[in-house]
């Protein structure tokens, strides 16, 4: 029987805690956060839950909460990542992170290399497994990209495309952490081009797609994300030698943030306004609503009215098969807001990221990780990929694959 510590009881952490509460192999789900009220509210809904207040800025606080656990699930903001990593090593337990902290080094790329190298060695030395990038993107989308490789002899280019078209009458530009969203959108993006990791301008290099299930052609642009880094670093071993890997993002959040960026309002450099020094980024962030996470909050937004409830997650892998150039299109279908709320009382963002994140946790619970050390979500074995996608289907998340001649997109 497993004991799991879930650090951070926001959208992702709370969803994972609820999923693990239903797993027969789980004896206890320890829910930890600095916000005691949020912890108490979550624990009230669980059969196996226990709450604890943790100050994640202090490693010893995490270590104390992790005593005797089999796994730490890190659903905290990125700056806490180094403390949680070190606490997992000190507690000699397995580790799962929805993201990949950018706080280990000044350069995020070097930080990920450090995790693949030094941290992987340290987890392997204690016989434990750590996995990063375990939400929907990164996470599910990485698993889908790996599955696409089965249909290619060699891969040239991978597009990881995400379009989020959800719009409500209530002002809600982001359905996840506004801080994370704006931080991503205020930075240069990453791409893997001609076999090298490069920085690209945010909102640049647009692509346009018309998918059958969307009512219009959509635009997706460069966006700072993990996938080109993981897949680029692992291209030779896991992605059939792909030389070009992109993450493209579009939808309501991009439409909201791009004009702000052009106006300089996502800058973190102080400017003088009427004799006062202000940071534009902080001013914008201060005026954004938090993502809804409680059932009554979500219900109120739905009752006020939903203008659009659509989206797309598509991996396009271009390469060679039997001497012919082909494209493998993998379309992910998942519940939108209304269906997610009907199924689980949560938002579509919570459903896709939290539920799909919990499937990486389930691989731990089922003792399916054979790897020791630190891996990312694109490095699963074929057996792990099969189990993950089968469980995803049980949650209403499916993948439709089309292999067709490549004529350019």
What feature does the model see in each segment?
Residues 4-8:
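Conserved N-terminal Rossmann-fold NAD(P)-binding element of oxidoreductases
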Residues 12:
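Hydrophobic/small residue at the entry helix of a nucleotide-binding pocket
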Residues 34-38:
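Helix N-cap at the beta1-alpha1 junction of Rossmann-like dinucleotide-binding domains, i.e.
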Residues 46-58:
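Rossmann-fold cofactor-recognition segment
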Residues 56-68:
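Conserved Rossmann-fold cofactor-binding substructure of NAD(P)-dependent oxidoreductases
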Residues 70-75, 95-96:
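N-terminal Rossmann-like NAD(P) cofactor-binding module of classical short-chain dehydrogenase/reductase
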Residues 99-128:
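Rossmann-fold NAD(P)-binding glycine/threonine-rich loop
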Residues 150-409:
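C-terminal catalytic/substrate-binding lobe primarily of soluble NAD(P)-dependent oxidoreductases
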């Amino acid at each position: 029987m497993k004991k799991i510590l879930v650090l951070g009881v926001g959208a992702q952490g709370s969803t994972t805690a609820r999923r693990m509460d239903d797993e027969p192999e789980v004896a206890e789900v320890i829910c930890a956060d600095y916000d005691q009220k949020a912890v108490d509210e979550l624990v009230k809904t669980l059969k196996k839950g226990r709450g604890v207040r943790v100050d994640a800025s202090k490693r010893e606080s995490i270590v104390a909460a992790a005593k005797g656990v089999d796994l730490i699930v890190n659903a905290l903001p990125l700056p806490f990542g180094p403390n949680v990593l070190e606490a997992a090593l000190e507690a000699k337990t397995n580790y799962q992170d929805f993201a990949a902290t950018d706080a280990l080094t000044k350069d995020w790329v070097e930080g990920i290399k450090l995790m693949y190298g030094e941290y992987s060695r340290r987890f392997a030395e204690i016989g434990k497994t750590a996995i990063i990038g375990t939400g929907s993107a990164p996470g599910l989308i990485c698993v889908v990209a790996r599955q696409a490789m089965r249909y290619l002899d060699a891969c040239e280019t991978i597009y990881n495309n995400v379009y989020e078209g959800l719009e409500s009458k209530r002002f809600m530009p982001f359905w996840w952490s506004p801080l994370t969203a704006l931080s991503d959108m205020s930075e240069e993006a990453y791409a893997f081009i001609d076999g090298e990791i490069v920085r690209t301008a945010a909102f640049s290099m647009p692509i346009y797609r018309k998918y059958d299930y969307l009512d219009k052609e959509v635009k997706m642009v460069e966006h700072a994300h993990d996938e080109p880094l993981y897949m680029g670093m692992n291209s030779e071993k896991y992605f059939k030698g792909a030389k070009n890997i992109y993450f493209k993002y579009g939808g309501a959040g991009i439409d909201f943030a791009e004009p702000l960026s052009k106006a300089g309002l996502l800058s973190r450099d102080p400017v003088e306004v009427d004799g006062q020094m202000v940071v534009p980024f902080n001013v914008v962030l201060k005026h954004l609503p938090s993502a809804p996470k409680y059932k009554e909050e979500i219900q109120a937004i739905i009752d006020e009215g939903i203008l659009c409830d659509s989206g797309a997650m598509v991996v396009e892998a271009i390469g060679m098969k039997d001497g012919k150039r082909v494209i493998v299109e993998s379309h992910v279908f998942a519940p939108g807001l209304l269906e997610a709320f009907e199924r689980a009382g949560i938002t579509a963002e919570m459903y896709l990221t939290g539920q799909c994140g919990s499937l990486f946790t389930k691989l731990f619970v089922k003792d399916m990780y054979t790897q020791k050390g630190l891996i990312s979500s694109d490095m699963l074995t074929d057996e792990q990929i099969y189990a993950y996608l089968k469980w995803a289907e049980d949650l209403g998340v499916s993948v439709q694959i089309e292999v067709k001649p490549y004529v350019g997109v």
